[in-house]
Amino acid sequence: MSGKGSVVLAYSGGLDTSCILVWLKEQGYDVIAYLANIGQKEDFEEARKKALKLGAKKVFIEDISKEFVEEFIWPAIQSSALYEDRYLLGTSLARPCIARKQVEIAQREGAKYVSHGATGKGNDQIRFELTCYSLAPQIKVIAPWRMPEFYNRFQGRNDLMEYAKQHGIPVPVTPKNPWSMDENLMHISYEAGILENPKNQAPPGLYTKTQDPAKAPNSPDMLEIEFKKGVPVKVTNVGDGTTHSTALELFLYLNEVAGKHGVGRIDIVENRFIGMKSRGIYETPAGTILYHAHLDIEAFTMDREVRKIKQGLGLKFAELVYTGFWHSPECEFVRHCIAKSQERVEGKVQVSVFKGQVYILGRESPLSLYNEELVSMNVQGDYEPVDATGFININSLRLKEYHRLQNKVTAK
């Protein structure tokens, strides 16, 4: 063992973390490479060989896809989580899941350090490190992109490319096409390079999870999605009878259907927690279908006033996830409250997936608050129309008083 001890590096096999692996060895650390299989398209055995060739003492490949869906994506679906009204939080949800396993490995291997390749300007450094400090405060974090001896040596990607050539590090990225991609089961993100100019449109061929909606099939897929306690438990393709009921298989199937129809693309400028705006392009196929389907069954089954409170909690949940506070007491509290709100969110939603869109076709539930007789225009039911007169009069009092004062002020 070297003098500085062992460090568990969150390793992707890409340019940054490959260079960081070699650099950490230069600094005197024994490097344990940790690859999280979280649903990305990756040759993990090839990545293992690469890490060992670059000098990793050990390599751990951990499949965390199932726990990612059940413990992180499902709470986000229950909460209808959107950051700044558009972002479904694919990367934000993955980071605490990845970091949790990294901490487990560090504790198991007796490593005093963990490390990551997140930049000093982004959100991921915060998400990784807040998770580490929450779960294992005794473990120290090595963040090369915040260390002067690293970032002064590597001013940008070209310096990393040169370093890679010098040390025999094979990397697929070239200076001509250097935008960053980050993929997991839920989504893929694209940023940096020519995308940093928010005016530039996404280059042809950039998207990898979804078909161009204009080239998508000319007939839709009709799906029935069943929910219990706000969580999808079964999906059925009405056309061909395909059915999936385990969390991971269900999610993968929805990714396939949504991707085929070009569902889930967004191009946004968002506010990073650290204080700057950034441009990101995202594909979130299955997450987009489930967002719309869950929203529909929730509105069908949940009391109006409870839902108003829950919507506020959902906004807070999205903010906490985005800013890295998954393991905070307030986020645990919010998740608990949202789970409570979902106890009666049960039923089936029929959707059409077609050329980039998700259309709600119908819904049914044994726990619905919808009363067809009460709302009918043809049946009076347990409702006296004359009662609406008093209801309107009472609600108009506040408006009358407000405008009486406004008229008095204007008259002056």
UniProtKB/Swiss-Prot annotation:
User: For L-citrulline, which residues are the binding ones?
Assistant: Y87, S92, N123, R127, S180, S189, E270, Y282
Q: List, alphabetically, the CDD domains matched.
A: ASS (cd01999)
Note the SUPFAM superfamilies from the entry. Adenine nucleotide alpha hydrolases-like, Argininosuccinate synthetase, C-terminal domain
Query: Which keywords fit this entry according to its UniProt record?
Result: Acetylation, Amino-acid biosynthesis, Arginine biosynthesis, ATP-binding, Cytoplasm, Ligase, Nucleotide-binding, Phosphoprotein, Urea cycle
Reaction catalysis annotation? L-citrulline + L-aspartate + ATP = 2-(N(omega)-L-arginino)succinate + AMP + diphosphate + H(+)
Q: GO annotations under biological process?
A: argininosuccinate metabolic process; circadian rhythm; L-arginine biosynthetic process; urea cycle
Please state the protein's primary subcellular location: cytoplasm
Q: Look up the record and name the associated disease.
A: Defects in ASS1 are the cause of a bovine form of citrullinemia.
Give the protein's recorded name: Argininosuccinate synthase
